[in-house]
Amino acid sequence: MQQPMVEFKNVIKKYDDNQILKGIDMALEKGKFYTLLGPSGCGKTTILRIIAGFTNASSGDVLFEGKRMNDLPANKRQVNTVFQDYALFPHLNVFDNVAFGLNLRKVKKSDVEKKVIEALKLVRLGGYEHREISELSGGQQQRVAIARALANEPKVLLLDEPLSALDMKLRKAMQYELRDLQQRLGITFLFVTHDQEEALAMSDEIFVMNEGNVLQSGTPVDIYDEPINHFVADFIGESNILPGKMVADYQVEIVGKVFECADAGMKPNEAVEIVLRPEDLDIVAVNQGQLVVTVDTQLFRGDYYEITAYDDDRNRWLIHSTNPAKDGQQVGLFFEPEDVHVMRFGESEEDFDARLESYEEED
């Protein structure tokens, strides 16, 4: 494994008696797109501020390319930040906004012009040098803010919820732009968001956070398909989460029935939680279903119907189907063993990863 670009070792951050970060361990490699994902107040922006040098860790080590940088001033770090509100100067034109950091560093005028033009070309705003900020759309203003950060040639770009102020269509377009930009530049991006769709769409790796802890890290596919606990399963996409009991390896009891699953290595009769994603549930005839449910409501979402149904024990089931159903209709539900994800209570990420690796070795 290559040396991490940024590394946290047991980083704790306190404000008086309030512990914001509770022993964070994480590593960011060169040239990858990382996302800190979690609800408001979970500590994700605090991590960004510590990396940028805007605040200090209360304890623990923050390393940059293997060197401790806890006490390194913000202006000495090869890091730049794009803020949620872009922090552009309305009285300066595009060129002067992008050049602002370079001028503070007293970069030669000829080099400033070259770096500004290159940065604007990177974000596809070549020729916009003399535009006023007020003449730009929200997406263009965001790209100016990114160009200003890139003009300083950082090794790590920090992005603090930069898409949150944009409308949905523009936000999705900017997801493509940011991902493409990161791949073209080959530098490390660390993106902060509470929007799981943004995280899944753009990231090489996601850190899911809650209450000052990193609960799970991994690729978007790994975290979506194999959530470690109830919080992650519920926060990453929509889920049916039900109590269950392991009967034996590859067999689990849900709603009083035994189903095949892809999980093993647990104690017989161990209490667990089960995740079934709505898109993995197929509506079939009642006599072909593994479960029978009664349709309660449905909403048309454009490319699928979101159907809410209940079984005889009043367990709620969320189903995503391309075919509509009728309110009050009884239908069967069918799913494959690999669609059943079993979560253990209190399992550490290390033990969880080891369990998943053991399945792969068996295959």
UniProtKB/Swiss-Prot annotation:
GO terms for molecular function: ABC-type putrescine transporter activity; ATP binding; ATP hydrolysis activity. GO terms for cellular component: ATP-binding cassette (ABC) transporter complex. It is a peripheral membrane protein. Residues 6-236 form the ABC transporter domain. It is found in: Cell membrane. ATP binds at residues 38-45. SMART domains: AAA (SM00382). Its EC number is 7.6.2.11. It catalyses: ATP + H2O + polyamine-[polyamine-binding protein]Side 1 = ADP + phosphate + polyamineSide 2 + [polyamine-binding protein]Side 1. It comes from the Bacteria. Keywords: ATP-binding, Cell membrane, Membrane, Nucleotide-binding, Translocase, Transport. Pfam families: ABC_tran, TOBE_2. Gene3D superfamilies: 2.40.50.100, P-loop containing nucleotide triphosphate hydrolases (3.40.50.300). Belongs to the ABC transporter superfamily. Spermidine/putrescine importer (TC 3.A.1.11.1) family. The complex is composed of two ATP-binding proteins (PotA), two transmembrane proteins (PotB and PotC) and a solute-binding protein (PotD). PANTHER family: SPERMIDINE/PUTRESCINE IMPORT ATP-BINDING PROTEIN POTA, SPERMIDINE_PUTRESCINE IMPORT ATP-BINDING PROTEIN POTA. Part of the ABC transporter complex PotABCD involved in spermidine/putrescine import. Responsible for energy coupling to the transport system. This is Spermidine/putrescine import ATP-binding protein PotA.
